[in-house]
């Protein structure tokens, strides 16, 4: 009996049937919004009325907008500070990677920030920084110093928000490093110890190379976290004081939602998307080269 079409092509068609729902979902909820945002960025539009074609006008305005310049500088500051998370997490991970009951209990406490919502983190640190009843000013009073309205100071507010953001970021990187430390090659470490490797030499030449995958992922997620920073800015300062803490993601939302400038907000979203795309492409190329043994 001659096989029907399905029997003859089952191995080829089965993957198509399984992938089609995911492809449709991706097209509707990812690709369509991306191209819609790109199209809207060429218009001046309040989200309700007629759309006025302005071409690259929004991008030219962005180039000359001081608030966008401030947002970019703040994103760079976030990036620099977030790159402190991997080394701090590594140092903390080495300290916590001990077979002591007290350390095991402390380890669970360090995981806590990772599971806390960013909204909760923002509220906790807002209360902590409060100049009237916050713990920060209680410590300053014990030291004989004047109260400090950290989030109201345009020179210090960024650092206050970044410190709050680093709390869960360090916890996430810590999990990566503890996983990497648990998977270290014990035989290699023992061989190096027999050969006389100790202290810094042991760490730099034996332990750190084995933690390379964890370090790579920690750096990648830290950079992405810095570029996508929005929630804590929105919760703690709303971009203030006087726009000094705004970042690209927050500026995008403020222009599109609060100022009713959908086109300008879409232009900001497009630029942020391109920056993230370039970085993600670099990341994927690095992963591919690493798998091929070219790194």
Tell what function each PLM region has.
Residues 5-295:
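A structural signal for multi-pass alpha-helical bundles of membrane permease subunits
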Residues 1-3:
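Membrane-interfacial, low-structure loops and terminal tails that flank and connect transmembrane helices
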